[in-house]
Amino acid sequence: MEGVSALLARCPTAGLAGGLGVTACAAAGVLLYRIARRMKPTHTMVNCWFCNQDTLVPYGNRNCWDCPHCEQYNGFQENGDYNKPIPAQYLEHLNHVVSSAPSLRDPSQPQQWVSSQVLLCKRCNHHQTTKIKQLAAFAPREEGRYDEEVEVYRHHLEQMYKLCRPCQAAVEYYIKHQNRQLRALLLSHQFKRREADQTHAQNFSSAVKSPVQVILLRALAFLACAFLLTTALYGASGHFAPGTTVPLALPPGGNGSATPDNGTTPGAEGWRQLLGLLPEHMAEKLCEAWAFGQSHQTGVVALGLLTCLLAMLLAGRIRLRRIDAFCTCLWALLLGLHLAEQHLQAASPSWLDTLKFSTTSLCCLVGFTAAVATRKATGPRRFRPRRFFPGDSAGLFPTSPSLAIPHPSVGGSPASLFIPSPPSFLPLANQQLFRSPRRTSPSSLPGRLSRALSLGTIPSLTRADSGYLFSGSRPPSQVSRSGEFPVSDYFSLLSGSCPSSPLPSPAPSVAGSVASSSGSLRHRRPLISPARLNLKGQKLLLFPSPPGEAPTTPSSSDEHSPHNGSLFTMEPPHVPRKPPLQDVKHALDLRSKLERGSACSNRSIKKEDDSSQSSTCVVDTTTRGCSEEAATWRGRFGPSLVRGLLAVSLAANALFTSVFLYQSLR
């Protein structure tokens, strides 16, 4: 130890370097040990390729796991294929069967899925299953031309197994209705996104504070204008000059023979006492600066104009304000007046002095306002009104998974793959529909069905009797028996009649629509597909669903279908029963909710074109209520007119005040 101490006393730097070396070696050893013995994570978060849901799985199963949400297998190779064989893809008996037993649920909740037997007949449903099986068993002649051959084969199957006319009419009606709802969702999302962006821009621009150099430049411009105003008021009388200092220069065009009396005005005596408190050399410098500025007023005006322009450039486009632009215009006008006075010299008229003084006073007032108001920005302050949809405030498009579309399993049964999933019609019961009250019509039942079952828009919004468009859409008091789930008639909502029940109904049957749907496609305007809307690459979540709820797969026997499998069934007459008191109260509440907008609907519906609009096309209706009559000149020009009158009043008051002060002080 004594030897080590003597060595450290002889070479202190060697001891310090040795300590640092030992510390570095220890740290490197600890780091290498941690790297060598690093523990792999036990679990990791993965994302499902099919339903885009995140799931926590063991680390070893990060490329081979089953999604608990959609029950799909996630395990892929580099070429995109599965990394293990899945026999359920080509063996039908390995697929699990979906239970058709009705689940115990709240009867007030709407039915999200309908039976395929309601939309397609038995023959068309069998044809769809056959097409899927034949397309799945397709083997190309040449593997390199698989895409071309499968497209040709698919077209051949479509031509061979066509839908019948009633099924085709029902499918097209569903597609049309879904297009309307999707267009309304997309447009509403765009308008809300635009409103949120404008609000964010307004908050951002109003909260941005001007930099310090911009505030200093505005204050300097105000001081220059105040100096010009003070010179115009007191420059000729010499109130700021003490008796022994340098005499003040007279303004251009002033009378040099008038010698001011230094002891006649009490204000001048007060200024002399104030200047007497300053040191003598400082007072001399101030008097020299006063005389220099009074003799070079044009240069001071040019300096003020340059200061305003520089402040606007430094502030930038976001902090650009109207008051800064107005102040710059006043400085430019003041510079022009001074140049005109120098050009005219002794022949300058008297009104030019009055105009110059008025402009200087107004510029001083505006400059003071611009220098003080440093936080209020007026960039995108003006808000443009957005387009509203009927019933938008009442929750027309809720964020509940009412429009969720199921993702069928890859290995699912072929029959369940082709079951259509129409949208939920709960928003149609919640919104305020523009409809006219019921009116009795002498038209017959076949005529009303012929008009209602056309593929185009409904020509008339009035319905007689029950007002139901389809034979399968009737109140639950006429259709449902004991033990069945009551369903309501959403197509009665579409047609403008009162709903028969607060619950949505299944898809309509299309019996009797063969004759009405044959020639209607040629005379109707084509629908705008939702895919044509340009979202500019934004990810639009149309069908959000809560994380704890998974969409259920629809079944072909969720609802009671006819025993013989046919669509065209005759319903036996039923004795009308007295509905329960709770159902009557609920129906009355829903009826009063739907009749809120009937006062203005009588006037607005008459203006609609029967060939291009429908009673339920909430997308084409872009105003709320009777907005066409409410948008008068008061709503359009009211704010602008008030602002214009206020600006004219302020300008006139400032002008007359400056003229009065100038005349009284002169």
Curated annotation (Swiss-Prot):
Topological domains annotated Nuclear: 1-213, 319-322, 375-644
Q: Where, per the database record, does this protein carry Phosphoserine?
A: S441, S444, S450, S454, S466, S477, S480, S529
Transmembrane ranges?
214-234, 298-318, 323-343, 357-374, 645-665
Where does it reside? Nucleus inner membrane
Question: What keywords tag this UniProt record?
Answer: Acetylation, Angiogenesis, Cytoplasm, Cytoskeleton, Membrane, Nucleus, Phosphoprotein, Transmembrane, Transmembrane helix
One GO MF term on file is: lamin binding
Q: Where does the protein principally reside?
A: nucleus
Q: Where is this region: Disordered?
A: 502-581
Q: Which portions of the chain have biased composition (kind: Low complexity)?
A: 508-520
Keyword Kinase carried by entry: no
Q: Which residues lie on this side of the membrane: Perinuclear space?
A: 235-297, 344-356, 666
A GO term (biological process) for this protein?
Answer: protein localization to nuclear envelope
Q: What membrane topology term does the record carry?
A: Multi-pass membrane protein
Family listed: Belongs to the TMEM201 family.
Query: What is the recorded function of this protein according to its Swiss-Prot or TrEMBL entry?
Result: Critical regulator of angiogenesis and endothelial cell (EC) migration. Promotes the migration of endothelial cells, which is essential for angiogenesis. Interacts with the linker of nucleoskeleton and cytoskeleton (LINC) complex, which plays a vital role in connecting the cell's cytoskeleton to the nuclear envelope. This interaction is essential for maintaining cellular structure and facilitating the movement of endothelial cells, which is critical for proper vascular development. Involved in nuclear movement during fibroblast polarization and migration.
Identify this protein by name.
Answer: Transmembrane protein 201
Species source reads: Homo sapiens
